[in-house]
Amino acid sequence: MDVLYSLSKTLKDARDKIVEGTLYSNVSDLIQQFNQMIITMNGNEFQTGGIGNLPIRNWSFDFGLLGTTLLNLDANYVETARNTIDYFVDFVDNVCMDEMVRESQRNGIAPQSDSLRKLSGIKFKRINFDNSSEYIENWNLQNRRQRTGFTFHKPNIFPYSASFTLNRSQPAHDNLMGTMWLNAGSEIQVAGFDYSCAINAPANTQQFEHIVQLRRVLTTATITLLPDAERFSFPRVINSADGATTWYFNPVILRPNNVEVEFLLNGQIINTYQARFGTIIARNFDTIRLSFQLMRPPNMTPAVAALFPNAQPFEHHATVGLTLRIESAVCESVLADASETMLANVTSVRQEYAIPVGPVFPPGMNWTDLITNYSPSREDNLQRVFTVASIRSMLVK
């Protein structure tokens, strides 16, 4: 894997810097590394593809070295280099695709394609000169079963979940109280509602709670907490739990009271915040508990009182909500996030070449399914294919 990264890094630098008019002295070190790559690869043969519709391709290497010059690189020099670069880039691209479409239930962190296994041989280590990628660093750690650490921006840690629970319901669905939520990606939105605006509740207050368990532990997380849930701020028609009918939700937004968010690890509270909004941090957690209250306003103008009458019909429904968004965090496991295209890269290649469903990944690389059942086998395979996708993205956008 590290050899594949070094190949890609060398080729990227060569493609960017070996251009007509450049002083040879400015790229002499790069050309020396480029020639070392050619020397190491010459005389070797590889085969890629042969799974799904990914075609079988045979690769052989017999290239001349780039020479030295005292002056600028001319058009002939650059054209010779380009022919070599293009072949190598095509080879790396196909090795990456061949690796990204394969999976294994055992030791899925290790190379699975014949071509990448061959590149792992000792003689190709002479190519290896650069392992500065976070993915390569963590792949090496995971391969040795040591602790890894990925930094993510808006990590997709929450499987998609959109539902509701009713703490009070009636057959006519005209006086409901409960909670509805939408968890997806890096964001939780939860709303508590009471059609009667807590008129018969103790102290005219309704208590709500929403607990979310993560599939992986996050550390040093920067989080945004807001006293609102905008996705639940407009009228909608909702299917009943049994699917037999529908009910109408017409929210009027109030500010939540006594808001508390707890971050827990193995059932122990690590961080707690009360009535604190904006940016917060959490050190180490695998569970988030949100609690908040809806309080009937003790003093109301006539216009507000008309929204919340003392008896039915309740045409407007008192609603309070919270939004929790994980902006950045560190995780030992690889995840899809907002700043990278690894999941899309892997999924698109598997779809384009009609790769059959294997023993590890769900059909279509469905992320909700994958993260919901994030087994050690899936973790190993996902880290490997994401690492390869990161290498491929250096050369192929």
UniProtKB/Swiss-Prot annotation:
Q: Where is this region: Interaction with the inner capsid protein VP2?
A: 62-73
Compartments it resides in: Virion
GO cellular component terms, semicolon-separated: viral envelope; viral intermediate capsid
User: InterPro entries from the entry?
Assistant: Capsid_hemagglutn (IPR008980), Rotavirus_A/C_VP6 (IPR001385), Virus_capsid_a-hlx_vir (IPR008935)
Q: Which residues bind Zn(2+)?
A: H153
Keyword terms, alphabetized: Calcium, Capsid protein, Intermediate capsid protein, Metal-binding, Ubl conjugation, Virion, Zinc
Question: Where, by residue number, does Ca(2+) bind?
Answer: N266, D286
Q: Which GO molecular-function terms appear in the entry?
A: host cell surface receptor binding; metal ion binding; structural molecule activity
What's one Pfam family here?
Rota_Capsid_VP6
Q: How is it modified after translation?
A: The N-terminus is blocked.
Q: Name one GO biological process term.
A: fusion of virus membrane with host plasma membrane
Q: How does it assemble?
A: Homotrimer. Interacts with the inner capsid protein VP2. Interacts with the outer capsid glycoprotein VP7. Interacts with the outer capsid protein VP5*.
What this chain does, per the entry, is described as: Intermediate capsid protein that self assembles to form an icosahedral capsid with a T=13 symmetry, which consists of 230 trimers of VP6, with channels at each of its five-fold vertices. This capsid constitutes the middle concentric layer of the viral mature particle. The innermost VP2 capsid and the intermediate VP6 capsid remain intact following cell entry to protect the dsRNA from degradation and to prevent unfavorable antiviral responses in the host cell during all the replication cycle of the virus.
What's this protein's family per the entry? Belongs to the rotavirus VP6 family.
Instruction: Please share what else the UniProt entry notes about this protein.
Output: The VP6 trimer contains a zinc ion located at the center of the molecule. The zinc ion is not essential for either trimerization or transcription activity of the DLP. Zinc-depleted VP6 has an increased sensitivity to proteases.
**Listed HAMAP family:** Rota_VP6 (MF_04126), Rota_VP6_A (MF_04129)
Q: What is this protein called?
A: Intermediate capsid protein VP6
